[in-house]
Each structure stands twice: as C-alpha cells, then as structure tokens.
Amino acid sequence: MDWETLKADCLACSRCELCKTRTNVVFGQGVPDAEVLFVGEGPGQSEDEQGLPFVGRSGQLLDKYLFAIDLDREKNCYIANIVKCRPPQNRDPLPAESEACMPWLREQFRLLRPKIVVCLGRIAAQRMIRSDFSVTKEHGQFMEKNGILFMGPSTRPPCCAARRTSPMPLPTLWLCGTRSTKCVSIPMNESSSPSAHFVRIHLPRRGEVLAA
C-alpha cells in the first residue's frame, strides 16, 4: 500500500465509535522519508477542526522544540498519533479505540521505516514501546527494538505543557536530531527561548539515559 492509498482509506475509516463524533480524521503530517517519527496520543479540538496533528498551542510548543534541533514537519520528520480521531472531551483513547486504529500507524511506520521514534506522552509510549512503560521510572531513555531507537517521553506531552500558566523550570525534553548524532535539552516552558545548546553525542546504547 502506498501513501496516497493509505491516507484515502484512513480518511474513510469507521472501525470504531470515534468516527461518529469526529470532524476530521487526523492522518498525520510530514515527509514520506523521515528518519524521525513523533507519535502522540490523539487529536485535540484544534487538530480535529483542521485535520492536522499538533496545530493548537501544543503544536506551537512542539514546533519550537523541533526548530531548535533543525527539525521541521514540512522538511525532515513525521508526526502521527495513536488514534486518528479525537476522543470526546479529550479523554484518553479507550483500549478498543487504540487497537482499532493501530493498523493505520503500523502502515505509516512500514512506509516511513524511521530510525528514531519519539513518543509524546504515556499512552504513546505504552503502545509503541511496552505496555507497562513507566514515565516516572523510564523517562528520557532510548530503547532499541529491531534496530530502531525508541524514546519515551521525558516529562509530559506538549499538550500538557502548553496548558500550564506558570513556568516549568526543571523538566526538560530530549529530542534527537536527524543525523542521530546530536541531542538538545529544551526547557519544557512555552515562554523559553527555542535556541539551545547542541550537544554532540554518539548513538545511545540500549536503555541509556541521556543527561546534560
């Protein structure tokens, strides 16, 4: 299946009850040969209205992070979600909804063949890395699966950070660049400057925690 066929089929999806309440299917956004894949939980209100992932305040925050490490959803990365339709009232996707939607993400994964997968939030990490993944115990760690580096959320997804009205001085977000050789620590604070110091590193070993 190619990208065009996959997207057309996904936009017509009726595999779960979310199809009855959605405005738009949020298929994903990015380049078809991206080495870095970001996976979120699911669309929010703004995403449901526009049909694109991470376009509200959380999207603006995420774009700051991407810009700081030379990533751009229009040029060299891809953004998708576990579920393609917005759960009502932005609740967590039900297990049945996630399971019904995962084949779409698996096909995107197969077409992309990314080198690095960054999970944006607990639910994404538990679906992509391991069902018992613990953000508290395993945040910011790289884990290798079948030659692909998976990274769990370092603190919380951008949608949570964007809703904060007070600064978040301590938590940081680790993202890895497209060449797999540079990482940057960016404050999880929407008011912070996106410019940050780049740190050259080697590929992390299995389970290695990257620290400043």
Model-inferred region functions:
Residues 206-207:
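Glycine-biased, low-complexity coil/linker segments
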